[in-house]
């Protein structure tokens, strides 16, 4: 991604900032680099890089937290990076080689998250998705805020036809604002039940999500 004179590159959980006009001349020099991950052994897969103004967002999936991980950073005029916040949004692994899950639109984070409910134990209380802010790393898992609920069973739109392998598909719109220390994300979420396969598209004014059954389940 390009921000003014800088190229921002995501590689193996690291961000590299390359100055394309060092000394106002043509060329390439490394301005800064930082790790998105906080530990080399962290079980997280980073695969999406978004930019808006001087803000950078890296999305991935944390298998330890069983959540989508969103890290927000800023870049200054010298190309130096500063971490603003890291959030966890409860979900199954969203990765799709042919599609994306996040977008930045008019200062809002727009994120798609799936939740597989085909094997829910009816004898146990359902743990509905929440969005949590990272505070510090613990011995085995991250220490986070309690978080805010995204939706519960009463908020989900039922499918219009019988669904063999039901997935709760949700789209959340979360204003990023200033992200002051301790702030939670205030997300508006729409959730509905559908088939496993999906296509996600976001414009500046609308969000589209198509879902279809997995052809192998037919």
What is the predicted role of each segment?
Residues 1-218:
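Beta-sheet-rich non-transmembrane sensory/scaffold domains
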């Amino acid at each position: 991604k390009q921000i003014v004179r800088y190229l921002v590159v995501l590689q193996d959980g690291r961000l590299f900032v390359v100055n394309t006009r060092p000394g106002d001349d043509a060329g390439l020099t490394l301005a800064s680099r930082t790790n998105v991950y906080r530990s080399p052994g962290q079980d997280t897969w980073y695969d999406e890089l978004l930019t808006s103004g001087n803000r950078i967002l890296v999305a991935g999936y944390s298998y330890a937290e069983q959540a989508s991980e969103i890290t927000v950073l800023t870049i200054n005029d010298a190309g130096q990076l500063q971490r603003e916040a890291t959030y966890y949004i409860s979900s199954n692994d969203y990765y799709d080689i042919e599609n994306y899950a996040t977008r930045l639109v008019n200062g809002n984070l727009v994120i798609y998250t799936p939740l597989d409910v085909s094997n829910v134990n009816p004898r146990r209380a359902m743990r509905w998705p929440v969005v949590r802010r990272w505070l510090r790393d613990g011995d085995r898992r991250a220490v986070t805020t309690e978080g805010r609920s995204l939706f519960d069973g009463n908020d989900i739109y039922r499918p219009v036809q019988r669904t063999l392998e039901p997935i709760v598909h949700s789209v959340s719109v979360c204003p990023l604002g200033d992200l002051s220390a301790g702030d939670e994300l205030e997300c508006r979420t729409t959730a509905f039940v559908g088939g496993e396969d999906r296509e996600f598209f976001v414009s500046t004014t609308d969000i589209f999500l198509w879902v279809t059954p997995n052809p192998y389940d037919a």
